[in-house]
């Protein structure tokens, strides 16, 4: 009876050692770091991406900061880009060299309100946009533009806050936009 318990113990220990050895072997094979760095225990500096659900409305100010769209889509699971109505999806995908397998994370809309409706349905943890890109410039004085300004601001303030977890409205200067977006994309 004792020899059976001992044999079972040694068998399980050998199986565990074999599993551990295989996992170490697999990590060496699949690692993109040079083996000399792994052996020394030195890690290359890599960006750590968010694990949160993030939705970003891509408007002119987001395009201006030139985010690495392909890299972000490839390395994150739950980041979605919603395109403003002024941005064509095909052109956006081509300019940012987005793989066709990742294009489902880029959503095209036809209207400004449509962008915000998409945010409601995505139900992301962080919803990032620059409302100033959707509002007419202050130099225009048309009553239609004033009505659009009022309606969009009212819509965002009254309706979106009821549906979205965290609304992150971007500042107007490009440096602050870059810092704010990076804060939510990278850990």
UniProtKB/Swiss-Prot annotation:
<comment type="subunit">
    <text>Interacts with PEX4.</text>
</comment>
<keyword id="KW-0962">Peroxisome biogenesis</keyword>
<dbReference type="GO" id="GO:0005778">
    <property type="term" value="C:peroxisomal membrane"/>
</dbReference>
<dbReference type="InterPro" id="IPR024359">
    <property type="entry name" value="Peroxin-22"/>
</dbReference>
<keyword id="KW-0472">Membrane</keyword>
<keyword id="KW-0812">Transmembrane</keyword>
<keyword id="KW-0576">Peroxisome</keyword>
<dbReference type="GO" id="GO:0007031">
    <property type="term" value="P:peroxisome organization"/>
</dbReference>
<comment type="function">
    <text>Involved in peroxisome biogenesis.</text>
</comment>
<comment type="similarity">
    <text>Belongs to the peroxin-22 family.</text>
</comment>
<protein>
    <recommendedName>
        <fullName>Peroxisome assembly protein 22</fullName>
    </recommendedName>
</protein>
<feature type="transmembrane region" description="Helical">
    <location>
        <begin position="7"/>
        <end position="29"/>
    </location>
</feature>
<dbReference type="InterPro" id="IPR038613">
    <property type="entry name" value="Peroxin-22_C_sf"/>
</dbReference>
<keyword id="KW-1133">Transmembrane helix</keyword>
<dbReference type="Pfam" id="PF12827">
    <property type="entry name" value="Peroxin-22"/>
</dbReference>
